[in-house]
Amino acid sequence: MPLPLPVLGSWRHAYASLQPAVTRGSSRLPVAALDLLIVGLTLAVLWLLWTRRATVRVLPLAIAVVVIAALGWLLFLTLWGWNYQVPTLEARLDLKPSELAAGPGETFARATVAQLNALHDEAHASAWPSRADLPRVLGPVMARTLPTLGIAATPLWPVPRRTMLDWYFRAAGIDGMTNPFGLEILLNSRVLPLELPALAAHEYAHLAGFADEADASVVAWLACQSGSPALRYSSALAVLPHLLTGLPRQTQRAVIDGVGKGPRRDLRAIAARLAEQRPWVHAFAWQTYDRFLRANRVAEGVARYDAVARVLIGAADPATGTLRRSPRPWPPSH
């Protein structure tokens, strides 16, 4: 359901104004809003089927299901989903093919490895931020980063919550999600402390209106790179696999050989956590999400996760942790 540009711009302003109230409300609930929604809908369906079991007709039931699904989709779009229609940072940065060659990609990957090696001891010297600490720790760096990307309003940052779907998150290899119906952040309970800052910043970027997965990862990297050694280290760990994906196999091995013992242990710990996933559940989850993204006009589907490498290689400076140029303003001025 594409919106005309003026309407989409007005909706974005309305979203920025309403997000703090919706997030504040969901944060006051005793459990995740998504859990309450799932339980409530399940009980309502069971109750209706039971009370009307003698008069259930297939056609009216099918029509009711379609109507409820359509209303749910419209609610999704209204609360958050129209953010998918905003041009991505990749499009707004007007990246050139010469900026995305293997040479710059290898340079950025090696710089990321060098940062991991340099920051490892300092990042591990003190305790990693807890989930309860994340709004306080990430709030200032997000507030510095968002205006440079065209977001004037500062969202309300909630404490990431656990969900009753945690077993599914672990089996499917899902690290976290933003609940569009409650504008809350839900994270996998098994995510390692050193992964939390970058992961939470990624989900906070979604709350700020960056629906695109690559955009959210770019925002998370930029925000964390302006923070403490722990934040910079976490963000470097998060983007390294994406940076390696686009490199030739021999170059990948050469870059990985440069990873020091400390960061190598951390990467192995992350790999061990991800090994807990069940392949068939992971395949089902990612195929479903791929269809969802394509339904929202994201042509690459889940491959958009790796597009973060294109944006960083083409427009970011690994030495300063900033973009070399600003993205085109959106909505465009007239």
Predicted regions and their residues:
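Short extracytoplasmic
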Residues: 29-32, 101-124
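Transmembrane alpha-helices and immediately adjacent membrane-cytoplasm interface residues
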Residues: 43-50, 55-90
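Membrane-embedded alpha-helical segments of integral membrane proteins
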Residues: 1-51
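Alpha-helical transmembrane signal-anchor/signal-peptide segments
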Residues: 7, 11, 81-104
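Pan-zinc metallopeptidase signature
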Residues: 261-334
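Post-HExxH zinc-binding segment in Zn-dependent metallohydrolases
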Residues: 105, 112, 211-253
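Active-site recognition of the HExxH zinc-binding catalytic motif
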Residues: 30, 196-222
